[in-house]
UniProtKB/Swiss-Prot annotation:
GO terms for cellular component: cytoplasm. Disulfide bonds join 103-202. Residues 152-154, 316-317 are annotated as: Interaction with tRNA. The active site is at 103 (nucleophile), 202 (cysteine persulfide intermediate). One of its GO terms (molecular function) is tRNA binding. It is found in: Cytoplasm. The record marks 129, 349 as: Interaction with tRNA. Keywords: ATP-binding, Cytoplasm, Disulfide bond, Nucleotide-binding, RNA-binding, Transferase, tRNA processing, tRNA-binding. Residues 98-100 are annotated as: Interaction with target base in tRNA. This is tRNA-specific 2-thiouridylase MnmA. It comes from Vibrio campbellii (strain ATCC BAA-1116). It comes from the Bacteria.
Length: 374
């Protein structure tokens, strides 16, 4: 048995294939493995869409198969206070938050880690995220790298982690491609081998986003206008729309000036007037940004920067890396200038920075720097 036999790892068991294979791999590596299933949302009795019971059953079946103990914990109160209330406040302010990033920060790598540490006496926690750790020579501080499977890389969602959290966390599937993960699950006859990956915001599930949000925030219908002020439609609430959005405007059949038949996109939200500004064509100047201003800056493995820095940035998940220049304003606020103008830069979302495969950190987009030709 390897030296790992004296190390206890608590695996976040979600009922999905990634956490299932993570638990299997860690056991193969000789660790003392136990599972912990988190319930982060209290569904109503009539909310049939919620899969928590099914996910727990799948997690239990996997743990039984692997002969590991499964603990359960309810973090619904922490989730409501630290994630969901922020989510609502951001939408109420006309911004577009990313609750999955905050869930990782406040729940999976904070509340979960604290419980595993203080109650279960863990040496490490482990998650089924597609990221990797690296320990540079002569430096005990670990870095976070993109997952080997570029299509599944989740470093964008984990940029808020600290060196200390990364050092205490294992990511067994980060070195694997997704098809390999499923192959291992099938070989081990795990019930989750062919289970569909979860998508969307965890507490909304498969239900329509507008229906869910409307339960918590009153909708405020208003006009959809062109940049020139012509009313061309109605929206049901600014919170239901995001910059660069094409679908859901319900003005698709309307021609613009001069018979322009290009599709319509959300170009701007006028919060003061409760008006949605729509523009035609994906190359419209109003959709473009030269850069952004961001706050809540967090570096994974470095002190706050004092000088201008070149790197790449993602302003949304699955986006190609954008070469950029970071100009520090103070320890928590920065200005980012893109090498080339970008579309759909959205306040409330995260700008995450990279040097090659290393995730450097990230920040919350406060406002975009509009294209000077717009």
């Amino acid at each position: 048995m390897s030296d790992n036999s004296q190390k206890k790892v608590i695996v976040g068991m979600s009922g999905g294939v990634d956490s299932s294979v993570s638990a299997y791999l860690l056991k193969q590596q000789g660790y003392q493995v136990e599972g912990l299933f988190m319930k982060n949302w209290e569904e109503d009795d009539n909310e049939e869409y919620c899969t928590a019971a099914e996910d727990l059953a799948d997690a239990q079946a996997v743990c039984d198969k692997l002969d590991i103990h499964l603990h359960t914990i309810n973090f619904a109160a922490e989730y409501w206070d630290n994630v969901f209330e922020y989510f609502l406040a951001e939408y109420k302010a006309g911004r577009t938050p990313n609750p999955d990033i905050l869930c990782n920060k406040e729940i999976k790598f904070k509340a979960f880690l604290e419980f595993a540490d203080e109650v279960l006496d863990a040496d490490y926690i482990a998650m089924g995220h597609y990221v990797r750790r690296s320990f540079p020579e002569n430096d005990e501080k670990p870095q976070m790298l993109r997952g080997l499977d570029s299509n599944k890389d989740q470093s964008y969602f984990l940029y808020t982690l600290s060196n200390e959290q990364i050092a205490r966390s294992l990511f067994p599937v980060g070195d694997l491609e997704k098809p390999e993960v499923r192959r291992i699950a099938e070989e081990q006859d795990l019930i989750t081998a062919k289970k569909k990956d979860s998508t969307g915001i965890c507490f909304i599930g498969e239900r329509k986003f507008t229906e869910f949000l409307g339960r918590y925030l009153p909708a405020q219908p208003g006009n959809i206008e062109t940049p020139e002020g012509e009313v061309i439609g109605q929206h049901q609430g600014l919170m239901y729309h995001t910059l660069g959005q094409r679908k859901g405007l319900h003005i698709g059949g309307r021609k613009g000036g001069g018979g322009n038949e290009d599709p319509w996109f959300v170009g701007e939200k006028d919060l003061e007037r409760n008006v949605l500004i729509a523009v035609q064509g994906k190359d419209h100047p109003m959709l473009k940004s030269e850069g952004l201003l961001a706050s809540q800056l967090h570096w994974v493995d470095r002190e706050p920067i004092r000088d201008v820095m070149k790197c790449t940035v993602k302003t949304r998940y699955r986006q190609e890396d954008i070469p950029c220049t970071i100009i520090p304003i103070d320890d928590e606020n920065i200005k980012v200038i893109f090498d080339e103008p970008q579309i759909a830069v959205t306040p409330g979302q995260s700008a995450v920075f990279y040097k090659d495969d290393v995730c450097l950190g990230g920040s919350i987009i406060e406002q975009r720097i509009k294209y000077s030709q717009a």
